[in-house]
Amino acid sequence: MKVLMFGWEFPPKIYGGLAVASYGITKGLSLQNDVETTFCLPKPTGEEESFLNIIGMNQVPVVWRDVNYDYLKSRLPNYMTPEQYYAFRDHIYADFSYLNVNDLGCMEFAGGYPANLHDEINNFSIIAGVVARQQQFDIIHAHDWLTYPAGVHAKMVSGKPLCIHVHATDFDRSRGKVNPTVYATEKNGMDYADCIMCVSELTRQTVIREYHQDPRKCFAMHNAVYPLSQELLDIPRPEHKKEKVVTFLGRITMQKGPEYFVEAAALVLKRTRNIRFIMA
């Protein structure tokens, strides 16, 4: 099975949990003998691991440019060959000459989450139309709302099933103060999706209730964890003879629930004083 996957970040460039989750699922799929994954990123670093195929959307042309082979070879990064560039160029499907493109006819991406994020999401989906016309694949997988438009476009072009991966909803990120533009993007992706993967049952229920999705196409798939390496296991554990230590490991954001940690600490410390709470 060939998977065409759209994601917004991937190690070694990590902005948050999305990169780690994207790595985990693609690494797991790579261990299956019958699965081949092509991962589309706005702006790869060129240092991504080689267990999957990387497509840099910033190297896929959307405007025809008559570029010779030697010049291409000098301009393209290590994850794109001139042959691949020409193959994509042959699948430009509309006149995008009004867009801001470079000398190769490609759109540039800032990477990460710039001020013009919604413009970059739209550009990403335009390029997805070229990729979906050129690539051979059996299923589409889109990570989070940023790539839902790309996934929907790829489905409309290819007719292949779309699976979207809901790492979080805007209800989770905003404590209920939902951005209507983000909500519309999320809901449109869910409406077009053939299946909706949610990171928890709580997220699944939010998708069903707030986005009015059919429960039959929504399922929870929890993020996995890797066992610790022997090198880490061999590190001597510190002895806390007088204190017990409770650690909060996570970003200090509403979504991770740090206030619950503080509230729990206050309750515990009313009963005992030999516990140290650490936010790391």
Report the location of each language-model feature.
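Nucleotide-sugar donor phosphate/pyrophosphate-binding loop at the beta->alpha transition
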Residues: 117-127, 160-163, 171-188, 227
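Membrane-proximal helix-turn-helix segments that form the acceptor-binding/catalytic region
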Residues: 129-134, 156, 179-196
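A short beta-strand/loop micro-motif in the catalytic core of glycosyltransferases
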Residues: 140-141, 192-201
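Conserved donor-binding/catalytic core segment of Leloir-type glycosyltransferases
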Residues: 239-256, 262-265, 278
